Swiss-Prot record:
One of its GO terms (molecular function) is mRNA cap binding. mRNA cap-binding component of the eukaryotic translation initiation factor 3 (eIF-3) complex, which is involved in protein synthesis of a specialized repertoire of mRNAs and, together with other initiation factors, stimulates binding of mRNA and methionyl-tRNAi to the 40S ribosome. The eIF-3 complex specifically targets and initiates translation of a subset of mRNAs involved in cell proliferation. In the eIF-3 complex, eif3d specifically recognizes and binds the 7-methylguanosine cap of a subset of mRNAs. PANTHER family: EUKARYOTIC TRANSLATION INITIATION FACTOR 3 SUBUNIT 7, EUKARYOTIC TRANSLATION INITIATION FACTOR 3 SUBUNIT D. Belongs to the eIF-3 subunit D family. This is Eukaryotic translation initiation factor 3 subunit D. It comes from Sclerotinia sclerotiorum (strain ATCC 18683 / 1980 / Ss-1) (White mold). It is found in: Cytoplasm.
Length: 577
């Protein structure tokens, strides 16, 4: 073949200005080129050669399939692509490719759990996507076996449910808790105070003075301060002793002091500490406030939540309510509170050296113990009635009388003088369970990393520890003993072991917790002033169960005194049937 010169090639090129296929009348509309399209097409790029199909390369479903932001990259004219498809000469619908790859048939995931693909798993079907699905552990990855009944907020696809929340679900609603007391229609709301306002209050007071003391104290057993050997752990024993937590208005000593006009405000250390530490509280509670003349009594209802010891109330992932019959029912808040209250009662009685010859008697006997009615001996307890000055000026004096409690007495190792102790107990239920708040394993870390263990407890139980510290300070206790009690078996809540006891000076512990007593006294004075400005009657201060808000209600005079009426009505109805 003869070679072609460059000049011949150039001369053979079309002489027209444009290049490409020749334009015919079939591909023009009034002389303008066009392409067939559908009105349902999404207008986008004219051509995107980098985009993959919905199923990824080779039609395989991939991770992109589960991207919540994924949207088919439809281009202009895609809806009518069949018009440009190549017409096959013969039917190839029966043609198939034999794959030599093995399909996975596993239907189990993790430790015995049924595997349902969740968001983030590869190769799942679109209709089984569940977002944060039924088998997702709270705070875990998609598809892991967890607490199926805890997090069923819907996702996308076939398991569609509620709306999606923001980044890391920052705006999702928290778990809803029930109020500690039912708000009745005839209650009148007077004030609503948020915790931010309470945190700004401040009132400096004195250290208080003792008015009188009742009861007796046993000496603390220093053997519990020693770290127990792992092979010989101390078991928490059931020690039946009579202890009392009488409300303010039912205390015979406070009634006598009120008749003598000793103070304006009367309270117990449990009620007062809850009010002073209210900005740290998360769980709901309520305090009954009774104004009689110029006197104010801070009371509690029978079987109120103030008597219960909370567990991990301030944890970022606090314990959650479990369904009835669930294996995690022992780790729900109400069960943990009962367990912690039981532990504190028995621990305080077990660490005493009970000896009639070596006990410290107060000026008066226990005002609540009646030997003719009680079958159990009285617990080691001293009730000290103390007086504090909450006056803003000398012209308007306001004093507070509070009943404080001391649990034990101990000899000072240096001076040999008696020191008053308060004894409390922290409890560990399961460091790996939901609601543990990232706590360390006490059995392995309490000795080597004691500071880290205590710091974690300060974070997870800020309100509880603050209340104990306030009670110790207003009682003028020298040392606050904290016991560390754990379950013998994490799955059982009826057997416990004592892992160690640590003592602190209450004011040093308060400074570590950033606890301000002047802020607490300011809160007390503010709430009391609200009631003194009102008429005589009964009021209820309620902590909102789901918001950091306190509400003050005015209630009828007979409220909370007819708790047994409901039972009588039910019995009458049954008899009529």
């Amino acid at each position: 073949m003869a070679p072609i010169s460059l000049s011949e090639i150039i001369s053979a090129l079309p002489s027209e200005d444009s290049w490409g296929p020749t334009t015919t009348s079939e591909t023009t509309l009034n002389g303008v080129p066009y392409a067939p399209y559908s009105k349902g097409d999404k207008l986008g790029r004219m051509a995107d050669w980098t985009a993959e199909g919905k199923d990824g390369r080779d039609g395989r479903g991939g991770r992109q399939q589960y991207n919540r932001n994924y949207r088919d990259q439809q281009v202009y004219g895609a809806g009518t692509s069949s018009l440009f498809a190549v017409q096959l000469a013969e039917d190839e619908s029966t043609f198939s490719v034999v794959s030599n790859t093995r399909d996975s048939t596993k239907t189990r995931f993790g430790r015995g759990g049924t595997f349902t693909r969740g968001r983030g798993q590869r190769g799942g079907r679109a209709d089984t996507r569940g977002g944060r699905g039924q088998f997702q552990r709270v705070g875990g990855r998609g598809g892991q076996q967890g607490y199926s009944s805890y997090d069923t907020r819907g996702g996308r696809g076939g398991a569609r449910g509620g709306r999606k929340f923001g980044w890391k679900d920052y705006d999702k609603p928290q778990r809803n808790r029930d109020a500690s007391v039912n708000i009745k229609p005839d209650w009148k709301m007077l004030e609503e105070i948020d915790f931010n306002r309470l945190a700004k209050l401040n009132l400096d007071t004195d250290d208080g003075e003792d008015i009188d003391s009742y009861g007796f104290l046993y000496y603390y057993d220093r053997a519990f301060d020693k770290q127990p050997v792992k092979a010989a752990e101390r078991k928490l024993n059931v020690v039946d002793r009579a202890s009392y937590n009488v409300t303010t208005s039912s205390d015979p000593v406070i009634q006598e002091l009120a008749e003598k006009d000793e103070a304006t405000i009367f309270a117990t250390d449990s009620i007062l500490s809850m009010l002073m530490c209210s900005p740290r509280s998360v769980y709901p509670w309520d305090i009954v406030i009774v104004r009689q003349g110029n006197k104010v009594f801070l009371d509690k209802r029978d079987n109120a939540t103030l008597d219960m010891v909370t567990v991990n109330e301030n944890a970022a992932d606090a314990p959650m309510d479990a369904s009835e019959g669930s294996k995690d029912a022992i780790n729900q808040p109400s069960a943990l509170a009962e367990e912690a209250t039981y532990i504190n009662h028995n621990f305080a009685n077990q660490v005493m050296k009970e000896s009639d010859s070596q006990k410290v008697e107060m000026e008066h006997e226990n005002p609540f113990y009646n030997p003719s009615e009680e079958t159990d001996p009285p617990a080691s307890k001293a009730y000290k009635y103390r007086k504090f000055d909450l006056s803003l000026n000398d012209e308007d004096p306001v004093h507070l009388v509070v009943r404080t409690e001391i649990d034990a007495v101990s000899k000072n190792a240096i001076s040999g003088e008696d020191q008053y102790l308060t004894v409390k107990a922290l409890n560990e239920f399961d460091s790996k369970a939901q609601g543990s708040g990232g706590a360390l394993d006490w059995r392995t870390k309490l000795v080597s990393q004691r500071g880290a263990v205590v710091a974690t407890e300060m974070k997870n139980n800020s309100c509880k520890l603050a209340r104990w510290t306030v009670q110790s300070i207003i009682a003028k206790a020298d040392v606050m003993k904290l016991g560390f009690v754990s379950r013998a078996n994490p799955k059982l809540n009826d057997r416990h072991v004592i892992l160690g006891v640590i003592g602190w000076k209450p004011r040093d512990f308060a400074s570590q917790m950033n606890l301000s007593l002047s802020n607490g006294w300011g809160i007390v004075r503010t709430i009391v002033d609200m009631c003194l400005k009102r008429e005589e009657g009964k009021y209820v201060l309620v902590k909102d169960p789901n918001k950091p808000i306190l509400r003050l209600y005015q209630v009828p005079a007979g409220s909370f005194e007819d708790d047994g009426e409901g039972d009588v009505i039910e019995e009458n109805v049954e008899e009529e049937d």
